[in-house]
């Protein structure tokens, strides 16, 4: 079994191996969801392979399941394929959430060369620095990209990652997502939410609800996009899922 990280700011997850299909009024998109930079997924079928259902995939399309259980198809150019041990190492690193649209620069200064433009919800690996290094570029964080390059982002653009992506290792056909996540966390599905609320909000449901509302407000002004999950465009399920996800609960 293989794994991958989304290596583009916003990757598209289609519900079919084909990106369009015939609708009642003409061609329509088969987009179902989006994967954001640095998010993990399980690769069920490699590009060009044959799925368990007997579907022959195009040579550039992979069958995936996101870390929160969404099944679909992704262009391989939007993925960085990794081995299991590499993904475990990645998930064990100091991960940070991109809290707003931001640039990754090659230097810790505004004049640096723009390496990538990330959207809210993307994930980066924060790199350790000595006290002297941190003081030398105060206000900037050193981050590792999925392709191994190092860049810098403004500290104010980053938030802690409060959710787990380890369900990618246990997800399998016939197993509910909550059970898959609980399996990797050595708990039970009914305890996932209470444990997240206890960890991040001291067990206060009121504090958790307030945090979800604050995260939701950060998408104000974002246009509606079918299947969207970023500041470029978002739909109703993507909006709710993202707000809860950023507060530590996967739904």
Q: Which residue stretches match the model-derived regions?
A:
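Terminal peptide-recognition signature
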Residues: 38, 216, 236-240
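Hydrophobic beta-strand signal
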Residues: 42, 122-125
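Glycine-centered loop/turn motifs
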Residues: 121-122, 221
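Short, flexible active-site loops
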Residues: 196-198, 219-228
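Solvent-exposed, polar/charged alpha-helical surfaces in well-ordered, non-transmembrane soluble domains
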Residues: 210, 214-218, 241-245
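Catalytic cysteine-centered active-site loop
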Residues: 223-238, 242-251
